């Protein structure tokens, strides 16, 4: 919508162009002008361009005003009054509400303030000009002229200079400048503007004359003249209480009003009528071009034309054509009704049958609305149950930021109320922008981004559920407690078979009843391991190495520091750390749980771990079990302690190395020889051992036993066995000397028994010289013989594919079988792999936290004795041994 000033100026310019176009059209075609003796207009035509009275002898001007009709106001006022132009009245002169002229707001030439549409229009008609300037209207609020023939009618706004001339004709006492019948001088009509509304808007009772679309004039009655009525301010002191508003949507409906005037509204139009009664009566004897009304007579229908466009349409139709019905009102332009400041009549003059007032928008109201601030929207309560922290007072509202729904930022769907679902991002497409609360920053403060690393399936969780304790995250934590509860129930049921205390003690001993050890290691230990590992940070910050991998065993290490636990827990930790067979952190954690069961301190350790807030914040994420149990869900910690409480009553004697003895990994279980090997493998092993003995004897030069044992290995190993394949493969390696042995390379093998080989060997065996034994060793590819390098026998050999292996099976057989290692030596076997000369350099000063650890200073060289696991080394310094953290040392190459 345009500003009020521009809208008023555009409307005046539009009226000005209509005046100019109509004047040019009439000046070029004089035949369109209506003469005095022309055919009278049809009864339905209420345009009333001229009257049949005394002014019917001359042509009319562009406003259909006859120059013969004198201006009643020209005799009294002088040139000073005529030359005055009131800009305030011109400001208040509004555009007509007629649809024909209200649908265009096109840009046109500006209308200067000193040129009214009438004055410009009158210049386009040559020959009708007069020396007298255009009379001006009275100023708003000025005192009215005295009653008499010289009183200036408000209709003089639209009169031409010709009609206002006093030379044309003598003034008539009952006609104004537009040939309109005037009332007595005591009556001053206060015309106004009426806007027609097809939709039935409220009608405000203002000072305006009635307007009808199809005003019908009876044949016997005089034609009413047309008037273009500006809007005048109402002088409430001069008017009596004669206001009346009539709303009628029925065509043909007649309403009787006051005795002084009456109106007729037709064709479904809403009209408001102003009846002004200043104590005068209508002259019934003078009916030329005016109204005819009497108290007892039928009211004459009157039509007031307020549109120049309607006048132009009537002139173009001609006198014989019917009136073109008005087009449907264009509601898009004339939504502003131009009305004076005094819009309402006096409150005491309103009748009882008033229609509801019409909504009238003035420039004054528009200015007040634009200056007024919009009413504050009442804040709405945010959806309940959104986060773990209470909502804070919101900062100044900002427009909410729309985000895409990502899989990593989905809210928890279970347990949400209807408000929570409407406000959650998943339901964002159902909730419109008008339903969002005015303080969106309250949710932005609550939605803290927590890391869910290490929690399975937690990448789909973007916010903890609510204070009520329901949600997928808490259901996951309850699942950990369910596993602990199931394992405790199985252990209690195992002890339920005992009849007395002695049987209970026997059922709790892993040496007497291994079932209890298996039950604890397969059910309780994995459940507690998963519970401690839940929400654990993957790495811990370290001063030297930067970060160290976290595990449940690192939680045990941090929880048993001096001053943070009892002495018994510290000694148990030292005992488990010294167990060399426990190489993994999981096996150490399981052994620690077994030790806590033996000392009945399992519940106590979990309770002390839960109370250490600094340790939990250092090791765990906010979504971990212990973090939630200490923060928002203390019921989880209480339930865990209640589940572990029955185990403190039972008596356990569990071996800390029970897992090492009974639950070895699959690779270690295959290392010892099977109890029942297959027969082919037994024969192969027997043949290897027997042949090794014979070969050793032959190399030593003893031949007495060869004949005695010649019949022993008569049983040849079956074809396809491991020993047969090894025998065939050994024939590939042949000596290149001059002994005359044929060179056989992956050809058909001559399968002979060891007895045949013994028959080939009598000549060398009879000679007890050491050279013969060297030859036999060289026959089987045994390296290290001094005669090979001296005689250069290997010079004629083929390339590397024919070279014998550096270490062969026969060379190992020559060395003999090592003595069996006692079982006690298996405990210290990992340390034997480490070389004795390995050393590490200390990177920092370290004080031993336990009796099994080694204290050292920065830069010292420590001798590595054994590798305990990936985190600890057993080192020695100055005859003192102990455990050293791997992260505090660097290997010396």
Swiss-Prot record:
GO biological process: protein polyubiquitination
MF GO annotations: actin binding
SH3 domain residues: 835-893
Domain RUN: start-end pairs: 515-659
PTM text: Phosphorylated on serine residues following nuclear translocation. Polyubiquitinated; polyubiquitination involves TRAF6.
Pfam families assigned: RUN, SH3_9
Stretches with biased composition (Polar residues): 77-87, 177-187
Keywords from the named record: Cytoplasm, Cytoplasmic vesicle, Cytoskeleton, Endosome, Golgi apparatus, Microtubule, Nucleus, Phosphoprotein, SH3 domain, Synapse, Ubl conjugation
Location(s), subcellular: Cytoplasm; Nucleus; Cytoplasm, Cytoskeleton; Cytoplasmic vesicle
Biased composition (Basic and acidic residues): 237-257
Segments for region (Disordered): 31-223, 237-332, 339-358, 366-444, 700-721, 751-772
Region (Interaction with TRAF6): 463-598
InterPro entries to which the protein is assigned, alphabetical: Run_dom, Run_dom_sf, RUN_RUSC1, RUSC1_2, SH3-like_dom_sf, SH3_domain
Biased composition (Low complexity): 95-117, 149-165, 702-714, 754-770
Residues covered by region (Interaction with IKBKG): 599-665
Expression by tissue: Expressed in brain, brain stem and spinal cord (at protein level).
Domain comment as written in the entry: The RUN domain is necessary for NGF induced nuclear redistribution.
Subunit structure: Associated component of the adapter-like complex 4 (AP-4). Interacts with IKBKG and TRAF6. Interacts with F-actin, acetylated actin, TUBB3, STX1A, KIF5B and KLC1.
Entry function: Associates with the adapter-like complex 4 (AP-4) and may therefore play a role in vesicular trafficking of proteins at the trans-Golgi network. Signaling adapter which plays a role in neuronal differentiation. Involved in regulation of NGF-dependent neurite outgrowth. May play a role in neuronal vesicular trafficking, specifically involving pre-synaptic membrane proteins. Seems to be involved in signaling pathways that are regulated by the prolonged activation of MAPK. Can regulate the polyubiquitination of IKBKG and thus may be involved in regulation of the NF-kappa-B pathway.
Name of protein: AP-4 complex accessory subunit RUSC1
Organism: Mus musculus
């Amino acid at each position: 919508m345009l500003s009020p000033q521009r809208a008023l100026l555009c409307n005046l310019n539009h009226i000005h162009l209509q005046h100019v176009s109509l004047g040019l059209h009439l000046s070029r075609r004089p035949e369109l002008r209506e003469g005095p003796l022309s055919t009278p207009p049809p009864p339905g035509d209420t345009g009333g361009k001229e009257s049949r009275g005394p002014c019917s002898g001359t042509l009319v001007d562009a406003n259909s005003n006859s120059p013969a009709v004198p201006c009643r106001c020209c005799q009294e006022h002088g040139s000073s009054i005529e030359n005055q132009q009131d800009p305030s009245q011109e400001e208040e002169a509004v555009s007509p509400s007629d649809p024909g002229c209200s649908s265009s707001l096109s840009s046109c030439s500006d209308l200067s303030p000193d040129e009214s549409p009438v004055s410009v229009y009158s210049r386009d008609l040559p020959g009708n000009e007069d020396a007298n300037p255009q009379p001006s209207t009275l100023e708003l609020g000025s005192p009215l002229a005295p009653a008499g023939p010289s009183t200036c009618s408000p209709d003089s706004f639209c009169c031409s200079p010709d009609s206002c001339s006093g030379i044309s004709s003598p003034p008539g006492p009952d006609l104004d400048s537009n040939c309109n019948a005037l009332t007595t001088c005591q009556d001053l009509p206060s015309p106004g503007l009426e806007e027609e509304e097809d939709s039935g808007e409220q009608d405000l009772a203002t000072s305006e004359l009635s307007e009808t679309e199809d005003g019908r004039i009876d044949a016997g009655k005089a034609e009413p003249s047309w008037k273009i009525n500006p809007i005048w301010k109402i002088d409430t002191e001069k008017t009596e209480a004669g206001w009346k508003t009539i709303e009628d949507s029925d065509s043909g409906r007649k309403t009787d009003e006051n005795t002084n005037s009456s109106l007729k509204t037709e064709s479904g139009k809403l009209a408001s009528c102003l009846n002004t009664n200043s104590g005068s009566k209508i002259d019934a004897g003078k009916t030329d071009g005016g109204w005819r009304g009497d108290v007892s007579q039928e009211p004459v229908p009157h039509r007031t034309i307020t549109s120049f466009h309607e006048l132009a349409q009537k002139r173009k139709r001609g006198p014989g054509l019917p009136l073109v019905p008005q087009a449907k009102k264009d509601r898009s332009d004339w939504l502003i009704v131009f009305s004076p400041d005094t819009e309402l009549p006096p409150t005491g003059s309103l009748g009882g049958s008033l229609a509801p007032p019409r909504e009238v928008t003035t420039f004054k109201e528009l200015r007040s609305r634009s200056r007024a601030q919009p009413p504050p929207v009442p804040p709405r309560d945010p959806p309940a149950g959104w986060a773990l922290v209470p909502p804070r007072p919101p900062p100044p509202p900002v427009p909410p930021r729309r985000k895409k729904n990502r899989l990593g930022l989905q809210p928890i769907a279970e347990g949400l109320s209807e408000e929570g679902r409407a406000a959650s991002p998943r339901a964002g497409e159902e909730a419109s922008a008008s339903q969002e609360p005015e303080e969106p920053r309250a949710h932005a403060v609550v939605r803290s981004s927590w890391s869910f690393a290490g929690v399975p399936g937690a990448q789909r969780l973007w916010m903890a559920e609510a204070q009520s304790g329901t949600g997928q995250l808490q259901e996951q934590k309850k699942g950990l407690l369910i596993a602990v509860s199931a394992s405790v129930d199985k252990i209690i049921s195992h002890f339920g078979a005992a009849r007395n205390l002695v049987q209970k003690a026997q059922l709790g001993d892993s040496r007497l009843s291994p079932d209890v050890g298996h039950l604890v290691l397969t059910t309780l230990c994995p459940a507690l391991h998963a519970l401690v590992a839940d929400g654990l940070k993957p790495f811990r910050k370290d001063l030297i190495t930067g970060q160290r991998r976290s595990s449940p065993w690192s939680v045990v290490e941090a929880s048993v520091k001096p001053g943070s636990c009892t002495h018994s827990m510290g000694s148990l930790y030292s005992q488990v750390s010294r167990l060399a067979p426990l190489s993994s952190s999981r096996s150490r954690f399981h052994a620690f749980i077994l030790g806590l069961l033996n000392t009945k301190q399992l519940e106590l350790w979990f309770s002390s771990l839960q109370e250490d807030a600094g340790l939990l914040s250092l090791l765990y994420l906010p979504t971990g079990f212990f973090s939630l149990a200490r923060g928002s869900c203390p019921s989880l910690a209480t339930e865990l302690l209640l589940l572990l409480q029955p185990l403190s009553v039972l008596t356990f004697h569990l071996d800390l190395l029970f897992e090492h003895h009974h639950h070895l990994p699959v690779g270690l279980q295959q290392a010892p020889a099977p109890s029942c090997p297959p027969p082919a493998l037994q024969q192969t092993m027997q043949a290897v051992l027997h042949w090794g003995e014979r070969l050793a004897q032959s190399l030593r030069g003893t031949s007495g036993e060869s004949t005695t044992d010649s019949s022993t290995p008569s049983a040849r190993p079956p074809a396809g066995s491991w020993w047969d394949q090894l025998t065939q493969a050994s024939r590939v390696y042949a000596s290149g000397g001059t002994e005359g042995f044929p060179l056989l390379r992956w050809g058909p093998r001559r399968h002979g028994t060891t007895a045949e080989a013994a028959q080939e060997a009598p000549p060398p065996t009879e000679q007890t010289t050491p050279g013969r034994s060297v030859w036999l060793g060289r026959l089987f590819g045994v390296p290290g013989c001094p005669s090979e390098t001296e005689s250069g026998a290997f010079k004629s050999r083929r390339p590397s594919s024919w070279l014998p292996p550096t270490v062969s099976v026969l060379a190992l057989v020559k060395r003999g079988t090592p003595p069996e290692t006692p079982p006690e030596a298996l405990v210290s076997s990992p340390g034997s792999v480490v070389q004795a000369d390995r050393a590490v350099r200390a990177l920092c000063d370290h004080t031993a936290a336990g009796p099994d650890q080694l204290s050292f200073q920065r830069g010292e060289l420590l001798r590595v004795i054994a590798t305990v696991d990936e985190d600890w080394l057993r080192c020695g310094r100055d005859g003192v041994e102990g455990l050293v953290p791997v992260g505090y040392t660097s290997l010396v190459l």
